Amino acid sequence: MVSYVGSLNYGYNDKYYAGFSFRRDGSSRLAPDTRWGNFWAVSASWRLSQENFMKPWENVVSDMKLRASYGVNGNLPTGYYGYHGTYTTGAFYNGKPAPWEDAIANPDLTWEKNYALNLGVDLSLFRRVNLTFDWYTRTTKDLLMSKQLNSISGFGSILTNVGEMKNTGFEIEVRSSNIQTKDFSWTTSLNLSHNKNKIVKLADLPEFIDGNYIRKEGCSYATIYLREYAGVDPNDGRPMYYDNKEDENGNRSRNIVYDPNDADRV
């Protein structure tokens, strides 16, 4: 991993702030044609509490700042040989040890890129209560994921850049200094966060199965793909399942079955 990093920051009159950063990263985990990525971010903030129109409120509003930032950063494959086809040993052929290909090469593998917008407020009241609020939206492009392959290929999956995903949410933190003396202090901290996740686009297929999860356009990345449990038969205690068989019109039946192999996953 090699990185070149630079940043510029500017502040004026303790009220207005701006920043810019840039980095260029190169990694041997990617092929020579795709291993370099350019990432950047811009930010700005306005300290309202320093403005003259806030003077009448200075005993209440100790500090207040509005923040905004936008930028892109990158993620690498977790493995060292993501773009290589690799071999392993341990099998025997005609009594002789033999290597075999256990991972398929992907020379087009590239950086996963996150485009993030963040808007925030920092607020201090009575010099005792501090509130931080952030709203964000993050779009991930060239999403890194193991895509399942047809078994006729001889491989189970391939690591590839499959599409686009979006996260949107907010974070709130409230901190208070309730008691502050020489011998005793009492502070309180509360936080709340919420995130909504959705796969926007998949490259080749509208959906594919990944273990007990389904990766599907319009659904969360962590959408579970299992047989639907219908409870326990009160007569004999056997587990029951909804069959969820789909007809030609796309409607699913809700018949009860006892063998999980007779039920479709949803």
Describe each model-derived feature in a short phrase:
Residues 22-28, 48-50, 70-74, 135-141, ...:
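Transmembrane beta-strands of outer-membrane beta-barrel pores
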Residues 160, 179-266:
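Conserved small-residue
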Residues 111-154, 186, 193, 197:
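Membrane-embedded beta-barrel scaffold of Gram-negative outer-membrane proteins
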Residues 18-20, 59-68, 119, 131, ...:
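Transmembrane beta-strands of outer-membrane beta-barrel proteins
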Residues 15-18, 51-54, 127-131, 170, ...:
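Repeated loop/turn-to-beta-strand initiation elements of outer-membrane beta-barrel proteins
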Residues 1-5, 91-130, 157-181, 218-223:
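Outer-membrane beta-barrel signature, preferentially recognizing the C-terminal barrel domain
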Residues 1, 17-26, 48, 94-102, ...:
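Flexible, solvent-exposed coil segments and beta strand-coil junctions
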Residues 62-109, 137-161, 200-203:
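Surface-exposed extracellular loop regions of Gram-negative outer-membrane beta-barrel proteins
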